[in-house]
Design a protein with these regions (language model features):
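N-terminal lobe of the biotin/lipoate ligase/transferase fold
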Residues: 1-120
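Short amphipathic alpha-helical segments
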Residues: 30, 34, 75, 121-132, ...
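Contiguous, small/hydrophobic- and glycine-enriched helical/loop subdomains that border
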Residues: 107-150
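Long, positively charged amphipathic alpha-helical accessory segments at protein N-termini or as interdomain linkers
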Residues: 140-142, 177-287
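Beta-rich nucleic-acid/ligand-interaction surfaces
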Residues: 146-167
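Aromatic/basic-lined ligand-recognition segments
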Residues: 164-172, 180
Length: 287
């Protein structure tokens, strides 16, 4: 397969971080703290060539990463209690307005870069991720589209769609000159159950019409779409090989002396975000 030019990938030197390899294992709040940290760390890395970060932060423990709008639900405590009853943890993420589900069948990937060295408009940044995922699906004979699936959870203009069904979504965060574009991909597992979980959460939390009315039928997994067995690790390796076609990936160092103090600070911010949710449940009158 002949691959097209991809300047965003080829014109960066990429550091590669995989939270699955971190010892000890990282909780969801720490993975989110690294998302916050990388866009602040990037200015320390820039040299003659633009520097970027590829961050895989898939979360095995069943977890819902809630968005800022979710935190304003009228009966948030009841919604969070519902998630707990279903065996799910939760955290408040720094990007994206609404919640997404994480489990062993979901792949999370972030691309972080510095706008000073590679300027991107908001739409253009989203389109880099769409292009990457689209190329990764070509060997499966799948064509990726990007448009909003309104009845999915966390609907957005750049929903990742195959055959009319959503397989993933993209969020974006900017801090000064730092940019992170993050995507989740439903690689395998029970996507209908994930959608039903989010529908139940919004119902329990008293969501009004400004929140999605989640319909499981509008979402699917990559494995179902391609009609063959596929797991998260296999698909992640395929993404790594694809990126490596354009530019070498260098293993990142979680203990980099410039990164550690940034992460230490951002970890406290991330923990505080999630603790604010936990306090909602603990403050319920019947708790």
């Amino acid at each position: 397969m002949t691959l097209p030019q991809f300047p965003y990938l080829s014109q960066h030197e990429w550091r590669y971080f995989d939270d699955a390899n971190h010892v000890p294992a990282l909780p969801a709040s720490d993975s989110l703290a690294y998302q916050d940290s990388f866009i602040r760390w990037l200015p320390h890395l820039q040299g003659d060539q633009a520097q970027g970060i590829v961050h895989f932060y898939s979360i095995d423990k069943p977890t819902v990463l809630l968005g800022a709008k979710d935190s304003r639900l009228p009966n948030l405590a009841a919604g969070l209690a519902y998630l707990e009853d279903q065996g799910f943890d939760y955290a408040l993420r720094p990007h994206g307005g609404l919640g997404v589900v994480c489990d062993p069948g979901i792949l999370n990937i972030g691309l972080a870069s510095d706008l000073t060295h590679f300027p991107l408009s908001i739409d253009a940044a989203y389109e880099q991720m769409v292009a990457l995922i689209g190329l990764s699906l070509m060997p499966y004979g799948l064509e990726l589209e990007a448009y909003e699936i309104a009845q999915s959870y966390c609907p957005g203009t750049y929903d990742l769609v195959v055959g009319g069904q959503k397989i993933g979504g993209i969020a974006q965060r900017r801090f000064k000159t730092g940019l992170t574009t993050a995507a989740y991909i439903s690689v395998a597992g029970d996507q209908a159950a994930r959608a039903q979980l989010m529908a139940g959460f919004y119902q329990a939390a008293g969501a009004d019409d400004s929140y999605p009315k989640v319909d499981p039928a509008v979402m699917t997994t990559l494995a179902h779409a391609c009609g063959q067995p596929l797991d998260r690790r296999t698909y992640q390796e395929e993404l790594i090989q694809l990126i490596s076609h354009y530019q070498k990936l260098v293993p990142g160092d979680y203990q980099d002396p410039d990164l550690v103090p940034i992460f230490t600070k951002m970890r406290q911010v991330s923990l505080a975000r999630t603790q604010s949710l936990k306090s909602e449940v603990n403050s319920k009158p019947d708790s």
